[in-house]
């Protein structure tokens, strides 16, 4: 298995991303010595991990940007034939305990989304995994309006959590950012604050970007 070294500069990262554009996942996997799964039912994170490997991402599962030394987060985004994202985009795990004093400026959501390299990938299920092509990468930073929308949603969601109302939050809350259960196993539990101030158990939650938000990013970049 080949393991590319981390890029030493932003230009090098963008060059690597540009060289991937137009390749199939099968071609990329062959170059890295990776087997290609027949489907992604048991390998949901496989595409993201493949792209991370090719570009030399360093974070792994740590709560930091994928290219911390460059200040860049990497996000693969599955799209349909018209270029629309097929699913929401995972950002990070949501803190359900010890939230007192936590501010937007210090939040992991803000840190992760300060600068993102988006890599679109064909995602429609009728295309075999190996044949799905990689699109042109986009280096994106949120506009002041996008930052304000993200902050407002984050602060409202965190207020629910701090008041012990995490169970009342649904994926419908938030204009651009939503909170959803984040666990491969529905039986997984983590501690949370309850409405009466005691500590209870609930499913781990994660922050996700809603589809219209990421679709707007792609539209702005590709002018469609």
From Swiss-Prot:
SMART domains the record matches: MutH (SM00927)
Record-level GO cellular component terms: cytoplasm
TM spans (from-to): none
Chief subcellular location: cytoplasm
Source species, domain of life: Bacteria
Family membership: Belongs to the MutH family.
Identification of the protein by name: DNA mismatch repair protein MutH
Species of the source: Shewanella amazonensis (strain ATCC BAA-1098 / SB2B)
Organism placement in taxonomy: Bacteria, Pseudomonadati, Pseudomonadota, Gammaproteobacteria, Alteromonadales
Gene name linked to the record: mutH
């Amino acid at each position: 298995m080949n393991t590319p070294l981390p890029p030493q500069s932003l230009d090098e990262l963008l060059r690597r991303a540009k060289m991937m554009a137009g390749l199939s996942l099968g071609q990329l996997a062959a170059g890295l010595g990776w087997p290609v799964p027949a489907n992604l039912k048991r390998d949901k994170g496989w595409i993201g991990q493949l792209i991370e490997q090719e570009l030399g991402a360093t974070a792994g599962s740590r709560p930091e940007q994928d290219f911390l030394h460059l200040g860049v987060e990497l996000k693969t985004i599955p799209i349909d034939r018209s270029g629309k994202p097929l699913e929401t985009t995972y950002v990070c795990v949501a803190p359900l305990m010890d939230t007192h004093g936590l501010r937007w400026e210090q939040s992991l959501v803000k840190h992760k989304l300060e600068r993102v390299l988006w890599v679109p990938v064909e995602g429609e299920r009728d295309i075999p995994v190996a044949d799905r092509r990689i699109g042109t990468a986009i280096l994106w930073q949120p506009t002041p309006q996008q930052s304000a929308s993200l902050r407002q949603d984050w602060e409202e969601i965190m207020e629910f959590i701090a008041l012990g109302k995490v169970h009342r939050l649904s994926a419908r809350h938030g204009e651009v950012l939503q909170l959803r259960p984040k666990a491969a196993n529905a039986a997984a539990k983590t501690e949370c604050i309850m409405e009466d101030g005691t500590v209870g158990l609930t499913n781990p939650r994660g922050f996700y970007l809603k589809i219209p938000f990421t679709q707007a990013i792609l539209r702005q970049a590709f002018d469609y």
